[in-house]
Design a protein with these regions (language model features):
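Bacterial N-terminal signal peptides that target proteins for export
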Residues: 1-11
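Active-site segments of SGNH/GDSL-like serine hydrolases
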Residues: 300-309, 324-355
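Alpha-helical scaffolding within the catalytic cores
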Residues: 64-73, 282-292, 315-324, 353-356
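C-terminal motif of bacterial Sec signal peptides marking the signal peptidase cleavage site
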Residues: 19-22
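Catalytic His-Asp segment of secreted/periplasmic serine-dependent ester chemistry enzymes
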Residues: 309, 342-413
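Loop/turn elements at helix/coil->beta-strand transitions in domains of secreted/extracellular proteins
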Residues: 79-82, 116-117, 268-271, 295-300, ...
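Conserved SGNH/GDSL esterase-like catalytic core that processes O-acyl groups on lipids
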Residues: 90-207, 212-316, 392
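N-terminal, intrinsically disordered, polar/charged segments of Gram-positive cell-envelope systems
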Residues: 27-79
Length: 413
């Protein structure tokens, strides 16, 4: 059973404001509305008159690593070699139908697999589905076969921005995933569980198809919203259809919170984590979580659409960008900021203060800035014409974003 819960700083918009937001409607489990430098930064990526099919441009992509990426050592908060994507619903994949195949982030992972030989799916949000208004879903489904769970949405203090919590011993959160989803090998040999730890947290028993594989002790003296389990390998002969049950331990004066899962082929290889969440704003994210997500070899930040649409305080917006900038500089992370605030023909100055802030942050961090309006102008099918309020790219739009990003990276030295 699922109870609904929100933090106070999540704002609900009227329908007129919804047109400005990169957000999707919530999963069916929760019916309330959600809102969602060497810098060649001004250089327009090369454009083509025709839209290439995904297999076309991916096939044409060189297998040579991107020259500006350095994976000689792991730099993320867990010691992994990683690329962390931090965005909203556009980057989570809304309107791409199958997030894990057709979103720009999924296509970018295909490019990374070609160049680096790694097929790790990485972090996947527990916000698994949207409604029919803006279609799409994650690779797994979430259910609650036992006990009561509360959803903390856009909570901001965990990687990925949302979590489920229970105060009942024996409560179970179930994650169902098929290792051959859609008839394609998903390269899932194991996984990590994300959870907050602290003095008021309990244990989490991890079962796969009824077999206990691990017990996570989240009870620690100090709070850490970004804890992650040890790698949990699947047993031999594990069936393709998997039920991962996360079962709460003793909750006397304690709770269990689960904030995500990461599907892994090889834990020693590069991981692309997509920490994007429908409805989130940059100003929603707690400083500690933001700084920790910026600990990676490469950080791709695509936030700003919801901040602009909801009129987020520009001072706070710039303060959060400063956190991103300083965290990347301190950690030696390469920062790429992608602008996904779409231009408006009837309002050329729309959201210019936010766009300028994004560009300036990339410049000041010695990173890269890429305006994805350059992808939008390649096709009149980039957005859904039948939904003029919808800022989420179509499958064609997602493909163009990934294509423009990879072309851009190929041309950097």
């Amino acid at each position: 059973m699922l109870k609904k819960k929100r933090f106070l700083f999540v704002f609900l918009a009227a329908a007129s404001l919804f047109t400005l937001c990169a957000c999707g409607a919530p999963s069916s489990q929760n019916s309330e509305p959600d809102l969602t430098s060497e810098t060649p930064s001004s250089e327009e990526p090369s454009s083509t008159s025709e839209t290439s099919a995904p297999e076309s441009w991916l096939d044409a992509l060189s297998s040579e690593p991107f020259a500006i990426f350095d994976f000689s050592e792991g730099k993320d908060m867990y010691g992994d070699k990683s690329i962390n994507i931090i965005g909203d619903s556009i980057s989570q994949g809304l309107n791409s139908d199958l997030f894990y195949d057709y979103s720009w982030a999924a296509l970018f992972k295909e490019a990374i697999a070609k160049k680096y030989g790694t097929h790790n799916i990485g972090y996947v949000s527990l916000l698994d589905r949207t409604n029919e208004a803006v279609p799409g879903r994650e690779i797994h489904t979430i259910s609650f076969p036992q006990g009561e769970w509360e959803r903390y949405y856009v909570s901001g203090n965990t990687p990925g921005g949302m979590s489920y919590a229970t105060h009942q011993q024996g409560s179970a959160l179930r994650i169902e995933v098929n290792r051959q989803e859609g008839g394609k090998d998903r390269h899932i040999n194991g996984f990590y569980v994300y959870y907050p730890e602290g003095p008021y947290r309990s244990t989490i028993t991890v079962q796969v198809n009824g077999q206990e594989l691990a017990v996570i002790n989240a009870n620690r003296a100090e709070e850490n919203g970004c804890a992650r389990s040890e790698y949990i390998a699947l047993p031999e002969n594990c069936p393709d259809d998997m039920q991962i049950d996360l079962i709460a331990g003793d909750c006397t004066d304690k709770s269990v919170i689960v904030s995500g899962i990461s599907y892994i082929e090889n834990p020693n290889e590069l991981i692309v984590n997509n920490y994007s969440l429908s409805g989130i704003q940059l100003v929603n994210i707690a400083d500690d979580a933001l700084q920790k997500m910026c600990r990676a070899n490469v950080v791709i930040l695509t936030l700003g659409t919801n901040d602009a649409g909801m009129g987020a305080d520009i001072g706070l917006f710039n303060s959060k960008l400063d956190r991103v900038k300083y965290a990347c500089q301190e950690n030696g992370s390469l920062l790429i900021i992608g602008n996904m605030i779409w231009d408006r023909a009837d309002d050329p100055d729309y959201a210019s203060v936010y766009k300028n802030a994004l560009r300036n942050a990339a410049d000041e961090a010695g990173g890269y800035y890429l305006d994805f309006n350059f992808a939008r102008i390649r096709s009149d099918k980039f957005l859904e014409a039948s939904r003029p309020w919808d800022v989420h790219p179509t499958v064609i739009g997602h493909d163009l974003i990934a294509q423009v990003l990879c072309e851009y990276l190929e041309n950097q030295e």
